[in-house]
Structures are given as C-alpha cells and as structure tokens.
C-alpha cells in the first residue's frame, strides 16, 4: 500500500515531529501561557528542562514503558544517593581528628619555669643553730613522741610529711632558705639574684624555689652560655655527734643529697615528686631542652578547655594539676581530712589526715615511760584518718575511673619540654681553691656556709704562695712541682675537696634548638569535605548540582505563587481574552493554522508497503491516509 505524506493533510504532522511539538508545548516561547498555569504544567515544564539525570526523560517520553524504566532508574539513583549521603553525614558527625607535626623556626621560644627543691627538706645547719639557741624543743619532743608510741602506720609517722603535718610552722622554720643555697646565678649572660625566684611549699621537700614563675622570658639563642646557670650549696653539714635520723624504706625520693629540679611550662604548677629529676652534688649537670607545642581542638572535635585552674588561681591550668586538686577534694569528702602529698585547696577548711590530736598532751601523760622500750610494750595510738587517706590514695592510684567525675580535660594550647641530661665531674681539684676563694670572700651568703670556710682554710694552707698567680707567672713552676706534701697535708687536701664536692653542684638549663615542634590537631573530615562529597554523590547518582537545586527552588517559588493566586480567585491554565467580538480567538486560530502549514510545507512524502498513518494534533489521534 502506498502512503501519502502527512503534509498533504492540513493539521497533520509526521511522527518525527511529534517529540518537538511536545517540547514546544511546555516551552514559554512557543505557548501563550500566563504565569497562572496549573501546577502540572509548571512541573512538566521545569521537568522537561531539568539538568537532573532522568527527570527530563520521564516528562518528555511518550512511551509508557520508557517512562516507567526512567522512573525506576531515578528512584534507584535517589535511594543510592540517600544511603551514601547518610554514611557521609554519619562520618562527619563522628568529628574525628588527625594530628599533624610541624617545625616552626620563626617564632620566639618561651623559656620554661624551673623549680628547684633541696632533696633533704630539713637544714641540718638550721637544726644545729636552733639546738644551741634552745629553739628546737618541739622538734625534740616530736622525735621522742614517735619513738615512745606505736602506730598502725609507723612508716608514715617517721616520715617528713608526718613531721610537717603535726608541727606545722615549726617544721617550716627548719626548711632551707634560698639565700643559704644559691651561690651563683646567671641567665642569658646576665647575673640573676634571689629576687628572681619565687617560693612555694611542698609536703615532701618543704621550701622550693621557682625561676621564671611569671616573667615569661623569651629565648633567642641556644647553648649553656645563653641559658640558666646556677651554683648551689646543698648544705650537707655533718649531723651532731650521736644524732641520726630514721631511714624510711617506704620512701623512694628522700635520704639523698642534691636538688630536685622540675622543668615545666611557664606559670604552671610544679610537681617535684612526679615530674622532677635529681641533680647530685659534685657534678656539673647540663639539661638540654627542646620546646614542644600542643594545639588541640575544642568541642565537638575534642574536649580541650581554656578554663582557669579551679582552686589555685596563681597557676595556669594543666591536666595534671586539675587531677591533683580533684584527688585532694575526693580525699577531703571521703575522709574528712586533707593530704600533705597533694596541693591544698583553699576553699576546703580541713586538717591533715596525719595529725594526732593533742599529741603533746599525750606525750606528757606518758612522760614516765621509757622511749627505748620494745615495740610490743609501747602504747598504741590509732590513726583512723590516716588509714582512710592511705586507703583512698591506693584506690585512686589503682583505679582511674574517678577522673570521669573530675571534669579535667587537656588544655587547648600547652607547651612542654623534652629534656636530655648529662653530667661531668665538677669542680676539678685544680680549680677548687680559686672557686672557693671567690665564693668565700665575694659572695655574701657563701661566707655563712660552714663547709666553705673549712675548705677554704684547708686549701689556703696547702697552697704555694705563687700558685695563685700560676696563670700569669710560671717562674715558680719548678718549686711547685718539686714540693712534697706530708700525709696529713694530703688528707687535708682530700677532706677539703670532699667538702666542696659533697656540698656544691652546678646546673645549666638551656635550649638545644630554637625550633618549636608543634603537634596540631585538625578535623579529619571537615565541613568542606562533607560538602564536596555531597556534591560528588548527588552528581554521580542523580546528576544534581547547585544549579539543579536552584531549579528546585524556582519550582517551589512558582508553585507557591500559584497557590497564592488561586486563593485570590485568579484563573489558572491558558488565558483567553475576548476583545472586539472574539478577535483574539481568530488571531489564535490564524497563528495555529500558519504553524501547521509551516510543518506541512517542510515535510516530505513517505511510502511503505504496509500502510500509512498520521497523527492529527487537532484530534489527538492517528488517522490512516
């Protein structure tokens, strides 16, 4: 059968023009629609022009099967995108962090605070002076008291802490003074003095002294010559004949000579027991430092804090100090007393757990008892508060769950220092006389040291008259080298050297490197990463971009306007205005007729042996030719 071209019938279009006519139906340039069209028309129009994958296919496809297939594909893509987006949001809400290390060379380095304690808390020289001045009655009474009675915690009652808890200010009077200990001080090539130190009290070491507690000194050079150099006298005088202390085998930090040194962040609270290092006498100790800066993220990525230290305002906040104060509060709450091993909380008014109430009265009531009697025969004094403290201290040290209730977090910014310690024999015997002579004659406080006077007198007697000028004149070298010393002189020289090396030490604390290693926390998956992955997910599964979202916003705006117009009673759909007796209808029909004729003039004839049909847009049906 022969088919006739669709152009032979007016208003009938060939099949290859049908898709174009459907698109033109919803295109604003080809339809005379007003802004008050129906919601379906608006959705269809924007759907046919949408950049999202699949939506235009659903709207423009004439075949129902194609519409269903594309609809299923769009639903599948939407489901996959939703699942992946939920995983991305869950990953973001975990607020994980990564830690990066960076070496900074251009920033000034803060010099740390340096806290120094004499390892032997009590000055034997002070005890000697108080003894001869009859000022040590309480000390002697206490020593007799602990020997006369038996305690459940005998080890503690013989400790320096029990001595302080029961004698209070009398015990503090026996502690060391910086004026007696400090023989020489130099910082950054300039002299420093006692006034550059602040004093704090520790229950284990008594008086301790801090350099750079509030000055915030900055360093711009490395090496021992540009750091802090100190020469100390540890005041290791021989005890009175026949007087000896009690060695406490349960104490691992006392009963030795030297100083305990803590290098800590400027303005932070020192803890000599936990963070200190021992510096022995008779050596020159060098402590090299390298600054490390920790920068942490606050909530929600972390739990760092910028709060002040609760309870002790003169110190900066540190995690360790917060825990120590929390331990003290817990012991006070559970035992009704405080511990001298922990920092005091000013807001709590409590006595020490090791205090024996009315111990002096008890001692007087048992004055007739022999303090040399056997342990079994000694009277027993219970100490329930001390037992509670020891029990709680043990529990807190073995179980850290208490930290959850303390509310202690790491500071958001914190400086720490890596330490490397080295020792060398000091001072050499060859230079001892020159050093002692200067300290003895020029340094005011050095003249008060008994060992200094004795050592200087011994060495002065042994010195050759020309030995002091050996550096300038070697004409008497033969006399010096050929001189022989008697056994007593050699013993005198050895005793003088031993006195110097048993009492003196040199400490150098300096920066090894001006670069600061910063460990900085960064979000492992930030908001920018989330937005980037959301864009990639929507683009992969649905072809949606920001512009596509703008199209959706436009749809919402136009539908909202449609609702408002309908509430005002405005017509919806195509608008026809009758002016001059239907001239508008005539114009519309004329334009449609011209459009149909344009398609008919453009089309060609099609032929086929099976038959022919055309689509009549005026009736919306196919008609055979």
Swiss-Prot record:
Its main location: membrane. It is a multi-pass membrane protein. Residues 575-591 have a biased composition (Low complexity). The chain crosses the membrane at residues 68-89, 537-557. Residues 570-591 are annotated as: Disordered. Keywords: Glycoprotein, Ion channel, Ion transport, Membrane, Sodium, Sodium channel, Sodium transport, Transmembrane, Transmembrane helix, Transport. GO terms for cellular component: plasma membrane. Glycans are attached at residues 134, 196, 303, 349, 365, 372, 473. Muscle and nervous tissue. It is found in: Membrane. Gene3D superfamilies: Acid-sensing ion channels like domains, YojJ-like. Pfam families: ASC. One of its GO terms (molecular function) is ligand-gated sodium channel activity. Residues 1-67, 558-625 are cytoplasmic. Residues 90-536 are extracellular. PANTHER family: AMILORIDE-SENSITIVE SODIUM CHANNEL-RELATED, PICKPOCKET 17, ISOFORM A. Belongs to the amiloride-sensitive sodium channel (TC 1.A.6) family. FMRFamide-gated ionotropic receptor. This is FMRFamide-activated amiloride-sensitive sodium channel. It comes from Cornu aspersum.
């Amino acid at each position: 059968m022969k088919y006739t071209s669709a152009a032979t019938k007016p208003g009938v279009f060939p099949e290859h023009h049908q898709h174009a006519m459907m698109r033109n139906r919803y295109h604003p340039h080809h339809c005379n629609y007003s802004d008050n069209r129906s919601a379906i028309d608006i959705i269809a129009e924007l759907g046919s022009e949408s950049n999202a994958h699949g939506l235009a296919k659903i709207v423009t496809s004439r075949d129902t099967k194609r519409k269903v297939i594309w609809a299923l594909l769009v639903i599948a893509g939407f489901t996959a995108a939703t699942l992946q987006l939920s995983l991305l949001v869950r990953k973001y809400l975990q607020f994980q962090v990564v830690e990066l290390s960076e070496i900074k060379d251009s920033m000034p380095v803060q010099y740390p605070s340096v806290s120094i304690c004499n390892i032997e808390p009590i000055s034997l020289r002070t005890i000697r002076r108080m003894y001869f001045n009859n000022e040590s009655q309480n000390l002697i009474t206490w020593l007799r008291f602990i020997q006369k009675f038996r305690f459940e915690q005998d080890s503690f009652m013989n400790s320096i802490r029990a001595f302080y808890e029961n004698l209070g200010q009398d015990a503090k009077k026996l502690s060391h003074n910086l004026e007696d200990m400090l023989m020489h001080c130099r910082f950054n090539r300039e002299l420093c003095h006692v006034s550059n130190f602040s004093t704090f009290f520790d229950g284990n070491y008594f008086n301790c002294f801090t350099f750079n507690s509030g000055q915030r000194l900055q360093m711009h050079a490395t090496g021992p010559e540009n750091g802090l150099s100190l020469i100390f006298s540890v005041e290791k005088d021989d005890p009175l004949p026949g007087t000896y202390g009690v060695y406490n085998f349960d104490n691992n930090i006392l009963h030795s000579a030297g100083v305990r040194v803590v290098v800590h962040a400027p303005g932070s609270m020192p803890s000599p027991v936990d963070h200190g290092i021992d510096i022995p006498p008779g050596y020159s100790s060098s402590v090299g430092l390298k600054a490390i800066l920790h920068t942490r993220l606050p909530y929600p990525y972390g739990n760092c804090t910028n709060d002040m230290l609760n309870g002790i305002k003169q110190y900066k906040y540190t995690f360790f100090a917060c825990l120590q104060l929390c331990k003290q509060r817990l012991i006070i709450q559970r035992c009704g007393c405080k511990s001298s091993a922990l920092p005091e909380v000013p807001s709590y008014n409590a006595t020490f757990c090791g205090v024996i109430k009315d111990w002096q009265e008890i001692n007087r009531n048992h004055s007739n008892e022999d303090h040399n009697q056997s342990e079994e025969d000694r009277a027993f004094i219970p100490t329930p508060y001390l037992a509670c403290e020891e029990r709680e201290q043990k529990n807190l040290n073995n179980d850290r769950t208490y930290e959850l209730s303390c509310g202690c977090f790491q500071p958001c910014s914190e400086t720490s220092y890596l330490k490397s310690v080295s020792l060398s024999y000091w001072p050499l015997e060859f230079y001892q006389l020159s050093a002692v002579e200067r300290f003895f004659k020029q340094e005011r406080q050095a003249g008060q040291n008994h060992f200094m006077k004795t050592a200087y007198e011994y060495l002065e007697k042994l010195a050759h008259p020309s030995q002091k000028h050996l550096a300038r004149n070697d004409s008497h070298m033969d006399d010096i080298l050929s001189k022989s010393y008697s056994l007593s002189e050699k013993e005198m020289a050895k005793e003088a050297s031993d006195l110097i090396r048993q009492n003196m030490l040199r400490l150098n604390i300096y920066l090894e490197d001006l670069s600061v290693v910063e460990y900085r926390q960064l979000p492992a998956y930030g908001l920018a990463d989330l937005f980037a992955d959301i864009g990639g997910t929507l683009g992969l599964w649905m072809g949606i971009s920001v512009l596509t979202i703008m199209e959706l916003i436009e749809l919402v705006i136009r539908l909202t306007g449609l609702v408002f117009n309908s509430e005002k009673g405005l017509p919806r759909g195509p608008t026809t205005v009758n002016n001059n007796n239907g001239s508008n209808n005539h114009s519309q029909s004329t334009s449609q007729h011209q459009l149909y004729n344009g398609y008919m003039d453009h089309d060609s004839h099609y032929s086929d042996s099976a038959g022919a049909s055309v689509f009549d847009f005026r009736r919306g049906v196919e008609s055979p030719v």
